[in-house]
Amino acid sequence: MPKKILFTGGGTVGHVTLNLILIPKFIKDGWEVHYIGDKNGIEHTEIEKSGLDVTFHAIATGKLRRYFSWQNLADVFKVALGLLQSLFILAKLRPQALFSKGGFVSVPPVVAAKLLGKPVFIHESDRSMGLANKIAYKFATTMYTTFEQEDQLSKVKHLGAVTKVFKDANQMPESTQLEAVKEYFSRDLKTLLFIGGSAGAHVFNQFISDHPELKQRYNIINITGDPHLNELSSHLYRVDYVTDLYQPLIAMADLVVTRGGSNTLFELLAMAKLHLIVPLGKEASRGDQLENATYFEKRGYAKQLQEPDLTLHNFDQAMADLFEHQADYEATMLATKEIQSPDFFYDLLRADISSAIKEK
């Protein structure tokens, strides 16, 4: 009878990425893999798109808010229903363990697993825990963290960033699409890549649209999240979404302009890619991106520019400063000890699962 593991996590791509790195390794080792999430969430889309042999189980989900809203009343019932559904799924599957990457949808499965005596392993990518993981931590066997947590928590293992990137550009798959893009770019101009993420692309899209003169100063690659903006013209490539092209585009760019999501930041760190961080503010997030950006700037990995300060003048100043000190930034990134390989984390997780099962 095959061993079973249940994954959960969703709401944004960042709450799915690590799961998609780990799942193939479990499948390769003969595990039966299941996933609990929202059928209308990005986790369902990403799992389907991956083509991996994973059984997806949909549950009801409600948003966890730190502020008063009448919607909280309705969401209490959704979360309760999600918990009942999770209990039923786990009781039926009887997995050896549950791994959660966080997000609102992950709380009911985590609680259900704990109630049924299953080991629970969770992961936190940001400088400080989000509300979902603050709740999940109470039910977890172990929490793995990308950043060292300021609070001394007994169940935390500081891991560093787990990222799957090609550090050598020669390892990346060739792309005829990328060659077509290069035909529209000038070798005399620096190439900038704007990555806004699922929650933050709009501001970058608008900034580029409002300042066509950027195309005279740089080659611009803009991952927009909006298919209506798709365009390939002189010094400009706008595309709504990329998968296989993602890392080749990063490698092609001289500098990346990004939000402050930890997954993207650590991918850029692993590739030692020069970058400017424009974090989402507290009006659009819980402030985690501000913390991540400040951490990266203090470590000497990057420079940050606050969204309200994103003017053409300030942007050009930031570009000039980054390119002037490019060698220093790259040397600091190359010397980092904060990156771990997927194989390292997989082996650690497998060992921790085995230990937890033996202790039951």
Curated annotation (Swiss-Prot):
Disulfide bridge partners, by residue number: none
Subcellular location per the Swiss-Prot or TrEMBL entry: Cell membrane
GO cellular component assignments: plasma membrane
HAMAP family noted in UniProt: MurG
Organism whose genome encodes this protein: Streptococcus pyogenes serotype M49 (strain NZ131)
EC number: 2.4.1.227
InterPro entries named in the record: GlcNAc_MurG, Glyco_trans_28_C, GlycoTrans_28_N
Catalytic reaction equation(s): Mur2Ac(oyl-L-Ala-gamma-D-Glu-L-Lys-D-Ala-D-Ala)-di-trans,octa-cis-undecaprenyl diphosphate + UDP-N-acetyl-alpha-D-glucosamine = beta-D-GlcNAc-(1->4)-Mur2Ac(oyl-L-Ala-gamma-D-Glu-L-Lys-D-Ala-D-Ala)-di-trans,octa-cis-undecaprenyl diphosphate + UDP + H(+)
Family classification: Belongs to the glycosyltransferase 28 family. MurG subfamily.
Keyword Cell cycle among record annotations: yes
Name used for this protein in its record: UDP-N-acetylglucosamine--N-acetylmuramyl-(pentapeptide) pyrophosphoryl-undecaprenol N-acetylglucosamine transferase
Pathway where this protein functions: Cell wall biogenesis; peptidoglycan biosynthesis
Binding positions (UDP-N-acetyl-alpha-D-glucosamine): S198, Q289
Membrane topology, from the record: Peripheral membrane protein
Higher taxonomy: Bacteria, Bacillati, Bacillota, Bacilli, Lactobacillales
Predominant cellular place of this UniProt entry's protein: membrane
One Gene Ontology MF term: undecaprenyldiphospho-muramoylpentapeptide beta-N-acetylglucosaminyltransferase activity
An individual GO BP term: cell wall organization
UniProt KW keywords: Cell cycle, Cell division, Cell membrane, Cell shape, Cell wall biogenesis/degradation, Glycosyltransferase, Membrane, Peptidoglycan synthesis, Transferase
Superkingdom, taxonomy of origin: Bacteria
Purpose: Cell wall formation. Catalyzes the transfer of a GlcNAc subunit on undecaprenyl-pyrophosphoryl-MurNAc-pentapeptide (lipid intermediate I) to form undecaprenyl-pyrophosphoryl-MurNAc-(pentapeptide)GlcNAc (lipid intermediate II).
